[in-house]
Amino acid sequence: MESQQLHQNPHSLHGSAYASVTSKEVPSNQDPLAVSASNLPEFDRDSTKVNSQEETTPGTSAVPENHHHVSPQPASVPPPQNGQYQQHGMMTPNKAMASNWAHYQQPSMMTCSHYQTSPAYYQPDPHYPLPQYIPPLSTSSPDPIDSQDQHSEVPQAKTKVRNNVLPPHTLTSEENFSTWVKFYIRFLKNSNLGDIIPNDQGEIKRQMTYEEHAYIYNTFQAFAPFHLLPTWVKQILEINYSDILTVLCKSVSKMQTNNQELKDWIALANLEYNGSTSADTFEITVSTIIQRLKENNINVSDRLACQLILKGLSGDFKYLRNQYRTKTNMKLSQLFAEIQLIYDENKIMNLNKPSQYKQHSEYKNVSRTSPNTTNTKVTTRNYHRTNSSKPRAAKAHNIATSSKFSRVNNDHINESTVSSQYLSDDNELSLGQQQKESKPTRTIDSNDELPDHLLIDSGASQTLVRSAHYLHHATPNSEINIVDAQKQDIPINAIGNLHFNFQNGTKTSIKALHTPNIAYDLLSLSELANQNITACFTRNTLERSDGTVLAPIVKHGDFYWLSKKYLIPSHISKLTINNVNKSKSVNKYPYPLIHRMLGHANFRSIQKSLKKNAVTYLKESDIEWSNASTYQCPDCLIGKSTKHRHVKGSRLKYQESYEPFQYLHTDIFGPVHHLPKSAPSYFISFTDEKTRFQWVYPLHDRREESILNVFTSILAFIKNQFNARVLVIQMDRGSEYTNKTLHKFFTNRGITACYTTTADSRAHGVAERLNRTLLNDCRTLLHCSGLPNHLWFSAVEFSTIIRNSLVSPKNDKSARQHAGLAGLDITTILPFGQPVIVNNHNPDSKIHPRGIPGYALHPSRNSYGYIIYLPSLKKTVDTTNYVILQNKQTKLDQFDYDTLTFDDDLNRLTAHNQSFIEQNETEQSYDQNKESDHDYQSEIEINSDPLVNDFSSQSINPLQLDKEPVQKVRAPKEVDADISEYNILPSTIRSRTPHIINKESTEMGGTVESDTTSPRHSSTFTARNQNRPGSTNEMIDLTSQDRVNYGLENIKTTRLGGTEEPYIQRNSDTNIKYRTTNSTPSIDDRSSNSESTTPIISIETKAVCDNTPSIDTDPPEYRSSDHATPNIMPDKSSKNVTADSILDDLPLPDLTHKSPTDTSDVSKDIPHIHSRQTNSSLGGMDDSNVLTTTKSKKRSLEDNETEIEVSRDTWNNKNMRSLEPPRSKKRINLIAAIKGVKSIKPVRTTLRYDEAITYNKDNKEKDRYVEAYHKEISQLLKMNTWDTNKYYDRNDIDPKKVINSMFIFNKKRDGTHKARFVARSDIQHPDTYDSDMQSNTVHHYALMTSLSIALDNDYYITQLDISSAYLYADIKEELYIRPPPHLGLNDKLLRLRKSLYGLKQSGANWYETIKSYLINCCDMQEVRGWSCVFKNSQVTICLFVDDMILFSKDLNANKKIITTLKKQYDTKIINLGEGDNEIQYDILGLEIKYQRSKYMKLGMEKSLTEKLPKLNVPLNPKGKKLRAPGQPGHYIDQDELEINEEKFRNRFFGTKAMRLRDEVSGNNLYVYYIETKKNIADVMTKPLPIKTFKLLTNKWIH
């Protein structure tokens, strides 16, 4: 039945065989002679398995089907016509059909195309199909061909190994012959003919028989068509058609020759050297490989060769890796010289002392100790590379074991599992890994071994023996494994003891390990030391600790040896020892493979997952776990690298030996931004390790001198106060600590500077935690007290005082107690920010208040006083003259302090400080007494001078006193502090003249109606104290008829302490005078007639104003608003007309008017720190000055107006117009300046879409904007700015990634209309861009220098512009834009691809894009130190965003750059710069007229002519141009080009000078500029110093 199936299906079977052969091939680089049946691919093993059945032809079910290939037909292999091989001398059928041939079956049964004319083959029978597999030859011994009598016995003598053999594939081309030969040789080996295949030398193991020869010949013909053979094969076969073995021999030789190059590369990549062989041998080996590669036209550079050699160095040579790691020019000869040097040194040292370790001359650390009774001490010289290095002997297997085995009982071996240990030294070995089979590790040549001796090794921590003959009490090893210096495993078979019997009958025993995989038997000196035995290498003896000689030691070669005759042999079976621990799992998967397959997960995670069956088809028992826990994956070490872990308390063991104040921790915090210059921006903290005492010092900068002064101070303080010397200071690696100045300071004082390691801030935990604690306290104290931020260091110092006095959770004493100081005196401490009243010991007048409100900060460091902050004076004082305020609420007024009143407690705690003492105030030592621009709100006085010349007269209206509406006033904006300095001092505040104001107008600023209301005489006055906490609006009730007569009787006043004075009787007689003034009076026109009359009321009171000079004598332009006299018309029937206030034009926020409050409490006079303070300098009369009868808690009065008049007279007489005017004028000038600035209307340069297109009534302009709009849209689509394939729903996108967009339209300077689609970067989220990226532009110094060089060298200047530059830069972040509203896509988003204009990162992206293109494609290099300046040998480019300025001696070089740019970018040529005539440029707003080799003129006349009139600033057309060559008489030499910053400033007197080149300029370079002195317009166009601002504003008014 089976034979019938074969007859019916011959082609399918044959095709399957071919599919199986061709579907899987052995790699071509595999050694053909090393291929065995066990190494065949899976299909070979499957084929063998299937064909291991009976010899009968298998059925179709037994043939494995290949589902991946279409089975080819047998006809696909074309048979050669007439057998292309030679016909003469062919084997006869009789020879081919010897008796033994029957055993191999018929030749026609092989899977091959038959040869019709070959006499060596029988014609195939059409009834027999070709089988799938070829029957192999037997393994019987060869029979001679002429032994005809034994034909019948041969088949019985042969034993078959395989029934069928997989045939090779058919040769398809001449180029594949070498690959085909590999498969053919494997086919012959599988056919039991491997011993007759010649090697590359042509040698064979035995002669083949005739039938074997015929078998090889026929199969070679079958699978290698003659016409596809290489030429050299054909030449061999033409000589001898049957010489197949010669073909195979030469093929093998050629394959090995072709693989030599690959072998050389592999050998070079796998170089290893540890000193076991001589350095000369190693150098010859490497040089030979490199030379052989060079002969094959492969040059190996010195750098590559050095890197490959360094990778394989180990042992004492390993440190060379670090030495050459940073070198760029590595020489092979130099590296060989270094290796030879180390090898020679080690050899010399080993000859002198066998226990000495090989070392480099630069790393010798000689230690010499004498032996004692407990431990063995051997004179060693150790090469310390790590802190844990140990003494080692040269060339010996250094072995280290766990401490669990040291000093163990000799009669018992601990069999418990030992955890793995990796020691720090490369030459030490560790235990704890499971044993696994490995080849013997013999890194030492054993030819120097002394037979029957033990090598004495000082570096080995365990004794190792190769023979179990001397091992007593041996137990199998189950878990212990040792690795050698090359990290190779040394399996341990057993653990036992060695018993010694020395000369004098002394017996001892040491632990030993048995392993056959070492070169020498090693005797560990550390094991002998445990038995009090010492090796004396000077007398060559083993001695006891008492000096008794136990045995001699012998020096042989480089080592010392102990004879084995002192060992007591055991009777243990060697076979038993070697077989006690066989590996139970041979076919387990290695753990590194599983580790990589499971994504480099950690060991515990993988093991636990397999236990929980989280991974199918893989069990825990299928993996080799022996080295899993200690396996180090290089990829994991690189990819998962982290900082080392800090163990709590690990630092203490290194510092517990220090005494108090010998070990300090220090760190710097800062800077704190947005502070006045007087406040410190940094602080430096110190902490003592032993006592944890803390110091803080303020710093204004981090310069070396500042840090050095602090260190000098604290070292002197500790030395004098605590009689201690600082030994160590720990700090980080900041430049303020690692500079040479501080290093020299530490060295001179013998202080050890202990730095943290790189990027390891946690190692500096003491100082870092202190800074965090102090800053937490600082924020809390400032927030609770409401004090300004510039007092932040006072809060830090207060926190330091408290922290030093409290006990920390980890200590049983406070820092003060540890330091031997007394505890904190609670009576000397006030809550931070406690309101107090400070005695003013130096008032300006005897009648001025003597108390100043303030806030307590912290106890003084330099006295017994307290540091108190005075908001009114804007400084801190050190004083004991203060009184604590009672019931004063702090900032947190929203809390109920009725139940939290601590007044009684504070009185009890500070009872002895409740009185004023002698005058002992001092200024704060670290400049906190200076005024701050951020401490308070400056005040602005109302200008009574007119701002315009035209005004109209109005009738004088009577006062309206019957209403008091609640209205809003406007608080002033913050201005410079120095402007309001006049109002800060207590002696310059209150007016001496009582006045009456309109009740209605008072709410709007205290305006007083007059008959003629002008901006000068009808000025609006603001009540400064309405808006200040603690101030009052309380005035005398003027609504009753009997009080309108200005009699002012029975007015009650209040003293500072809160007690009421008796009622003062006021004089009711008033003298009302009228004064005529000019609207713009001069100093000399006091009596001239004016266009309006102002009623001046002089109210003479006997009690207050008897000594006050007449008000009429004061011209109004010199009258400060603090002394402004109210203009009141006595006619009560006149109507009330309120004049417009100047403050209406100021951009001030509205504040709701507050009703008058009770001011009986003194504490309410303290200005609240966080409120907007105002005073009378805002332009109105102080409410407290109304009739001088309010319940005044204000600042002190002006002494008298006579002083002001005298100062004015002096001013006028000396005519000092160029100096600073009197302070009484500052506020008027400032208001005028602000008024003038307000009059300048801003000019909008851009339009929105609706303004430019939708509602634009100018049709021509609209059409131009529409054209520009479509042009921008086209450019956006052309550049693929966004993803046009998909719209995104805004609900599906993170709002942080969404940015609004808009179209803006403008008109450029050249008249063209421009449209730009931009992103709203003002609402861009910070997470969507990298804040560190910067958009660089060319510095003006670089541009001016390039222009000057171009002028001197006759360069061509070409100006270019790149259209839509930002759109060429890709965007890395995922961002979406919301289309503009006019597109109607309200709920859709677009995904950005390009850097759209307006994005934060667009400028940086474009800069990186164009920079990369200029460097890579245009062969440019960026000039170091000047960003956006690129240069090559011919062209210099200055880049300003999308504008380029090209400078070149040859115009063709510029054109070449332009051509290259046009390939990538849309480049426009603004000005090519060709020609010799004058060429005009407009570069970044700078107008340049340039004529090569003649002149270059720079200016801004055109742009200034267009811009300045828009700012209402007239342009002086008569400006004179000056010719200034720089500093007169000074010339720059070549040697003076490089100067430091200080010399630069001194030489050019602070001018922004250009960097000039003397050899370029030739002393002929002149700069033309317009000299502008201090101009009034500078107030609006420049940031000015305060004095310059005052001066210019004063000029403006006059």
UniProtKB/Swiss-Prot annotation:
Q: What is the lineage of its organism?
A: Eukaryota, Fungi, Dikarya, Ascomycota, Saccharomycotina
Please give the organism: Saccharomyces cerevisiae (strain ATCC 204508 / S288c)
Source organism superkingdom: Eukaryota
User: Which Pfam families does the record match to this protein?
Assistant: Pol_BBD (PF22936), rve (PF00665), RVT_2 (PF07727), TYA (PF01021)
Q: Where is this motif: Bipartite nuclear localization signal?
A: 1193-1227
Q: Please name the PANTHER family in this protein's record.
A: TRANSPOSASE, PUTATIVE-RELATED, TRANSPOSON TY4-P GAG-POL POLYPROTEIN
Zinc-finger listed as a keyword: yes
**In the UniProt record, what gene is named as encoding this protein?**
TY2B-LR2
Q: Which residues form the Reverse transcriptase Ty1/copia-type domain?
A: 1353-1491
- Protein name (database record): Transposon Ty2-LR2 Gag-Pol polyprotein
Give me the stretches of Basic and acidic residues compositional bias: 1151-1165
Binding of Mg(2+) 2 occurs at D1361, D1442, D1443
Q: Where in the cell is it found?
A: Cytoplasm; Nucleus
